[in-house]
């Protein structure tokens, strides 16, 4: 026992009571209910921070408090002391740590509850006191005003207005509502003086006051009310900012009164929004002028959306314009322009062809142009040594060296002369690319070298080549080949050229004729000099610094390389990696290969190259243009593909030759191009001479080519390029030509009698002439009465005086023998029934289309317009 007491004495001193070391909360929290207008309130959490100090008393640490501020705090202190005493007593009984923590928590909950109850009680007391004070102040103010008014009324009947004014003046000073005790001593002072006066008034004259309540007294009473309203206490100036933000403190919560700013109610917010909406509606919305983009065809709904109007309004506008359309119906750009103008917007017309705008670039100035090599096409009969001449010219290329047997990789190549000048040659067997390029109006070839054998002279295919060159509008240089043969007669060739309007320099013309021998390599230098001289006369120049443009000479699909196009660059410089468009195809340049099979990085003007990287295979003769990015290339290629599909669809729908020449009827063309193929030369000459005599100053037949033999692919290509007619006299087309004609839409006519040819051609030429319009008189009608019909307009009641009046005919309105209107007859009725015509002596009702200025006594002249076909 003594040992245990010794151990208790030796126990070290602790800063807290025995048990687990804990920290009590130094921040007490509570909740305060904050009130708003319309009976709304919300609970706000507040915090109170305390500074706690402890001292040692009786071997344990106790908290030192500043003092008990209220009875509740004293009770709490006593309760805390009891709990601490109980805890010390319980420590002797070995309480567990969990029990100690539970008791401590229960104590804290009790303290917090007491604090909340006290805070709510104080808040309620303060609020009730403020309400009672405000009510008492309002009652005192009302009583004071009533006494002053009574005193003023009593003083008015007396002849002392001077005394009444000082009595009312003490009311003028305003006092704050918060100063409630101030009016108490002032209340008996104000009416102290008027009381004897009010009592003396009935003593002197009892009926004076009732008689005094006249109109003047009522007016004075109104003025007193206005003065009282003017002297109302001024509102308390708000010292706090509106829409207070931040944390609510205990002081603000306990001292809350009516002066504090309250939040806006939901009803006030709704009223403000309604006022703004009404103000916006009353002000009226200003019309917004928009820029409406209108394509070639647009639906009514889409047009309404772009103008930001209702579709029904657009339909009404179309009805006023005489167009009946539904919401989903397409209208043309002209009608859409009228609608947009009617609504007051600005219109911008666009077309699908706008994607091609700016594709060719701007025109080059003379400062940026440099001389470029000429592009030469070698043409002629296959047996006249054209291939041998090409091989001989290629062998003179100083770049290729002495080997000479260089394989030609592409259909075009470039030769460098000994002088350093370059010439680009294009090999066009069959002339497919040449005619296709002419059809697109592309002037690819600068000079044509016409090869004619000195021993054979002019052959049918030579004549065909001459016509191709003339159609392209390029100068011709005649190369008279095979002069080394014994039977060569160059002079005969020059004489035969005169029949085809080619006059050589030896005969006084301007056509250069060079006598050469491809086999013996004679006068090749003279031919090259003649080409360079002609190029110098043409002054061929190009800008090498701009975006590349050119033409596709030929295109093919190769295994392992994909689509490969042979391109002749005309302007600019083509580089690897550039994006380009070739006809309806596009791609990116993956590689450039020259005519010697070498890969190059770029190609300048008049340079033929192979281009790899196409997405598809273009057609020979398509234009080749580089663009800025792939998006533009896809857009252009897509547009051209659609145009090609539409053109093919139109060709498939075309059934007669008259439909093919519908454009000619509208005045777009005045010539009928024809290609003639026959069995014998005599028949061809007869047909040609007959067709050339046809026509007049307005229309005529243009013979593109006339030869003996079957119809082949070259004839189809020539007819397609010129959009002409192909005539076969006692001959037929081979299978390849038929397939090509079916694909390209070329019309082939077969004949066996020459008179049938002349009759059909005469009808075609007559169809090209515009028909003659002739007026046919129908009758007269006199207007006897004018009726105004609802939803119809003015209707003329007429009597037919001469001839017949037909529905749908043309009419003239005559007034005093002067024509004042010419238009169409809209309606023709007899006894409310629509009739086709009305004869002389009958009455009828007539209305005019889009015209209502009709009067009694006017005369209506009815007539028809007849189209008379013009014949040759």
Swiss-Prot record:
Q: Name one GO molecular function term.
A: translation initiation factor activity
Where is the region G4? 481-484
G3 as annotated region, ranges: 427-430
Location of region: Disordered: 130-282
Composition skew (Basic and acidic residues), residue ranges:
130-155, 271-282
Q: Name the species this protein comes from.
A: Paramagnetospirillum magneticum (strain ATCC 700264 / AMB-1) (Magnetospirillum magneticum)
The protein's matches in InterPro entries, at most eight in alphabetical order, are given as:
EF-G-like_DII (IPR053905), EFTu-like_2 (IPR004161), IF2_assoc_dom_bac (IPR013575), IF2_II (IPR044145), IF2_N (IPR006847), P-loop_NTPase (IPR027417), Small_GTP-bd (IPR005225), T_Tr_GTP-bd_dom (IPR000795)
G1: annotated span: 380-387
- What is the protein's given name? Translation initiation factor IF-2
